[in-house]
Each structure stands twice: as C-alpha cells, then as structure tokens.
Amino acid sequence: MKFVDEVQIRVDAGDGGNGCVSFRREKYIPNGGPDGGDGGDGGDVYLVADENLNTLIDYRFERFHAAERGENGQSANCTGRRGKDRILRVPVGTRASDEDTGELLGDLTHHEQKLLVAKGGFHGLGNTRFKSSVNRAPRQKSNGTPGEVRTLKLELLLLADVGMLGLPNAGKSTFIRAVSAARPKVADYPFTTLVPNLGVVRGENSRSFVIADIPGLIEGAAEGAGLGIRFLKHLERCRVLIHLVDICPVDGSDPAENAVTIVRELEKYSPELASKPRWLVFNKMDLILEEEAQEVMDRVKTALNHEGPVYAITAISKEGTKKVCYDILDLLDTMPRQLAEDAKDAIEKVEFKWDDYHKNQLAKAEADALAASKAFDESLDDDEWDDEDDDGVEVIYVRD
C-alpha cells in the first residue's frame, strides 16, 4: 500500500435542527398553550486513532466528510433527534491542524484516542421556551445554527524512539536491516529509500525500541533539493537521533563536509530537532585502514564540535551494531517517555464556534421576556385612575 503521510480534507459538522411553533389542541382544551419542541443538535466530527492503520491514503481519494443534521422539533414538546457524529479513523501519530488559520487542533498519540475537530450546530428553540407571564401564546422560535466547517491538514508523524540521519547511500537501510526484522530496499544508487521505514530492535529482558529510517538528505534539502526535508517531521517525536556517516564515500567526497551538511540542513528545518541527543556512528569501517579511519573520525568530530557518543560499525556484516543498540536501550531507560504529556501541554484549548451559543441563546430569551414584562407593568401604571387629577364633572347614576 502506498505510504501517504499528509492530506487535506474538509469536514462539515451537522446543522442544528429548527425549533417548532405549535400549540396544544385537544378536545375540551381549546387554549392549551405552547408545546413546540426544540430541534436536535447537529452531529460532530471526530478523529479516532487506530493502531491498525499506517497511512492516510484513504483520505487522498475521499476528501469531504459530513456529519448528520439534527432533526427539527415537533409538537407535544417533542425534541428533534440529534444528528449522528462522523468518526474518521486515522493512524496513531496523526496531527490535525486547521488549514485556514494554522491552529493546531491536537495530536493523536495512542490507540482509540478521540479528538473533536468540528462541532455540530446548536439546536433551535421551540416556542415553549419563549412563554412567560406576559406572553402566554408565543409565536417566536429560533432556527438551528449551522455546523462548523473546517479544512483540515492531517499529518502522520511516525512514533519512533530513534531516528536515523545521513546522506543517501550512507548505509541507513543496511543498518536497520542488520538490527531489526525490517527489510527496506538496499541498492547501490542514491535515494533507494523513498518513504520512511520502521524497525523494532529487541534486546534482552524484553527490552526494545522502534527505529525510523528516512530518505537521505543532501545539501539544499531545506530549499527542496532531492526529496527535500518533508520526511524530517517523522523524527520530531524521536528521543535520540543517530547520525550515520559514510567514512569512505564512493564519490570521493569529504566525510567531514558531508556530516556538516546534514547538521546544517537539520538546523534549518528545526533548531528544536537539532538540539535532540545525537549520536555519531561511522559506517563502512571495512573499506578503510584503521589509522586512516581514526584520522577521518577526528576530523569529523572537530568539524561538528561533537561531544556525544561516537561509534564505528560495519552494518553489512553487523560488526559493532550490537553495542550501539544495547547502549541505546540503556539510554532510553533513563529517558521516560513523555510524549502524551508534552503534546497535551503544548496544545492550548481549542475554541469551537458554538461552545457558548446555548448559554447566550437562553440568556437572550430570558432578557426579552423580562423586558416585555417590565414594559407591560409600566403600561399598567400609566393607565391607573387618579381622582385628584380629575377636574371633570362627576356623573352619578341612581336606580329608581
């Protein structure tokens, strides 16, 4: 199945049902009063994380998704049925944002997590809601509000503990094949890897971690060269980065310059991502003499001003790969996963269109009824008879 990690869709929440104007009419009850019911709320649109999905390809072909409209109110104070919600299932790791405003709506980081992305319209009020002591037979009602409409940008960010960086043909896919059961394509030409690959590395005592292999970066990737930097987003949730350096490039380029290029492109994309713990791993040690290898490693460390861990491996023969994996497991044990908490803290409360509408609607109805009652009382005061102010002739009728 084709890997699709970014799509744009439109979601339409359901409109609210209209209120009803109706009066109770039964035998021997000619003036029964208002009995118009409220409409039903419109259905909401939710995203739900599903661990059985690994791509957003379904939304590449179906881009319009709408919830059900609420039913109108009916007589006998019958409330309209609420519209059915629309549930959109997406892979775990999906991030949703509003394409028009850029507002981040939420991250779905665990199975069956539910995220509201479009709120249904509020129901209209029936004429029963508008009755008062001065308005015994109200003929006003309110219509339901339209449901929220959003254009969503869905991005799939892979959930991996360790991410791999490097130039094309540095040996990233060979490394992930050596340490896990993943089988990405390996060949002797650049950009063999076109989409991210995940592998699970298992250690002793049931310890394990997930490693992500993304397509290689080249100079100018931030400006769109090669495959660009669109896949770097998959490393944002990684806790550790492995910078894989080809110690003996087949094109004769300088490994130090190549390493600096990768770090420079990483910093252009995201300084926060560049600040993550980064390990330097030199690959293809079998192609160079030990003395030359040490000199190259020293030059690369100096060029990068690297003070973190450094490893030398030969991925094709798995030499040195085991120590790298076991050291990563030890490091991850000291770095508790705080993905869900960090995501929750990073996202501010999302405001939806009709959050407080029902409060405002009822408050307005009460204010209108109060104003009408006050006006009626004032009219009674103006019509009261005052004998002291009457200078006319008093007429007295006497029965014979």
UniProtKB/Swiss-Prot annotation:
Q: Which domain of life is it from?
A: Bacteria
What are the record keywords, sorted?
Answer: Cytoplasm, GTP-binding, Hydrolase, Magnesium, Metal-binding, Nucleotide-binding
SUPFAM superfamilies assigned to the protein according to its UniProt record, in alphabetical order = Obg GTP-binding protein N-terminal domain, P-loop containing nucleoside triphosphate hydrolases
Q: Where does GTP bind?
A: 166-173, 191-195, 213-216, 283-286, 314-316
DNA-binding as a keyword of this entry, yes or no, is no
Q: List, for all copies, the residue spans of the domain called Obg.
A: 1-159
Its needed co-factors are:
Mg(2+)
Compartments annotated for it: namely:
Cytoplasm
**Which Pfam family is an annotated match for this chain, by its short name?**
GTP1_OBG
Q: Which GO terms describe its cellular component?
A: cytoplasm
Q: Binding positions for Mg(2+)?
A: S173, T193
What are its E.C. numbers? 3.6.5.-
Q: Name one GO biological process term.
A: ribosome biogenesis
Provide the top EC class: hydrolase
Gene Ontology molecular function, alphabetical: GTP binding; GTPase activity; magnesium ion binding
Query: Any idea where the OBG-type G domain is?
Result: 160-333
* Record-stated family: Belongs to the TRAFAC class OBG-HflX-like GTPase superfamily. OBG GTPase family.
Q: Which PANTHER family match?
A: DEVELOPMENTALLY REGULATED GTP-BINDING PROTEIN-RELATED, MITOCHONDRIAL RIBOSOME-ASSOCIATED GTPASE 2
Q: What does this protein do?
A: An essential GTPase which binds GTP, GDP and possibly (p)ppGpp with moderate affinity, with high nucleotide exchange rates and a fairly low GTP hydrolysis rate. Plays a role in control of the cell cycle, stress response, ribosome biogenesis and in those bacteria that undergo differentiation, in morphogenesis control.
Per UniProt, subunit arrangement is: Monomer.
Against HAMAP family, the record matches this protein to:
GTPase_Obg
NCBIfam families this protein is in?
Obg_CgtA, PRK12297.1, PRK12299.1
| Identification of the protein by name | GTPase Obg
Q: Which organism is the protein's source?
A: Aeromonas hydrophila subsp. hydrophila (strain ATCC 7966 / DSM 30187 / BCRC 13018 / CCUG 14551 / JCM 1027 / KCTC 2358 / NCIMB 9240 / NCTC 8049)
